[in-house]
Amino acid sequence: MTTPEPQAAFKRVMLKISGEALMGDQGFGLHPPTVERVAREVQSVHALGVEICMVIGGGNIFRGLQGSAQGMERTTADYMGMLATVMNALAMQSALEGLGIHTRVISAITMNEVAEPYIRRRAVRHLEKKRVCIFAAGTGNPYFTTDTAATLRANEMSCEAIFKGTKVDGVYDKDPAKFADAKRYDTVTYDDVLAKRLGVMDASAIALARDNNLPIIVFSLDEPGGFRGILAGEGTYTRVQD
């Protein structure tokens, strides 16, 4: 007799991860074993029947702000960063489909040969069919981060929460890598995140989540089974919500 899957806490979620989460220890680019490990985390949540949206940053390949700081025109640098997110999305799509999970890459910048254009109703239909939707190219506009893009798409897709996968198991009052006495919050309000500059997401993303009462769950992507554990009512994390 097989053990039934636990009931998931959410029906539809947005998973936001940085591009750096896919580069492993190599310091740049994509590390295929790391991409596959993250894909398996997504697979374990997909098995619970959860509808999954994803947004992946592009910082492992190119950061628009860094390019701008080095003299490149900001708009051009941001577009380059958006293209980097498409590369990461395609890598994740390949890994997920290798695990048998139907996946769609949906780009805010039209590139029909490699990704679908963003059409909200079509994306919702993909989710209803249990396809993972990876939203790429940010919002399609410069000056907006992938955190803001993830929050925007999460609202448009009627996600019940954003899961922000990081290197630490929640939000701390100070950097736990530098301060042994750093304390983790179980819950924290949007306004406290902004006022204390806790670095969960950029201010625009936090404000957009707050204005739409969209919870943000901050957890460690490096913890095996952490994503699934939270959805099954376990694990360590911080919940950002009023």
From Swiss-Prot:
Metabolic or biological pathway, per its Swiss-Prot or TrEMBL entry: Pyrimidine metabolism; CTP biosynthesis via de novo pathway; UDP from UMP (UMPK route): step 1/1
GO CC terms of this entry: cytoplasm
Sequence positions that bind ATP: K16, I17, S18, G19, G59, R63, T166, Y172, D175
Keyword set, alphabetical order: Allosteric enzyme, ATP-binding, Cytoplasm, Kinase, Nucleotide-binding, Pyrimidine biosynthesis, Transferase
Top-rank taxon, per record: Bacteria
CDD domains: AAK_UMPK-PyrH-Ec
Reactions the enzyme catalyzes: UMP + ATP = UDP + ADP
Entry keyword Cytoplasm: yes
Start and end residues of each stretch annotated as Involved in allosteric activation by GTP: 24-29
EC annotation from Swiss-Prot or TrEMBL: 2.7.4.22
Known regulation of activity: Allosterically activated by GTP. Inhibited by UTP.
GO biological process, one term: 'de novo' CTP biosynthetic process
InterPro entries documented for this protein: AceGlu_kinase-like_sf (IPR036393), Asp/Glu/Uridylate_kinase (IPR001048), Uridylate_kinase (IPR011817), Uridylate_kinase_bac (IPR015963)
Binding site for UMP: G58, D78, T139, G140, N141, P142, Y143, F144, T145, T146
GO MF terms held by the record: ATP binding; UMP kinase activity
SUPFAM superfamilies, per the entry: Carbamate kinase-like
Keyword Glycosyltransferase in record: no
Cell location: Cytoplasm
Assembly with partners or alone: Homohexamer.
Annotated family: Belongs to the UMP kinase family.
HAMAP family (alphabetical): PyrH_B
Protein task: Catalyzes the reversible phosphorylation of UMP to UDP.
Protein name: Uridylate kinase
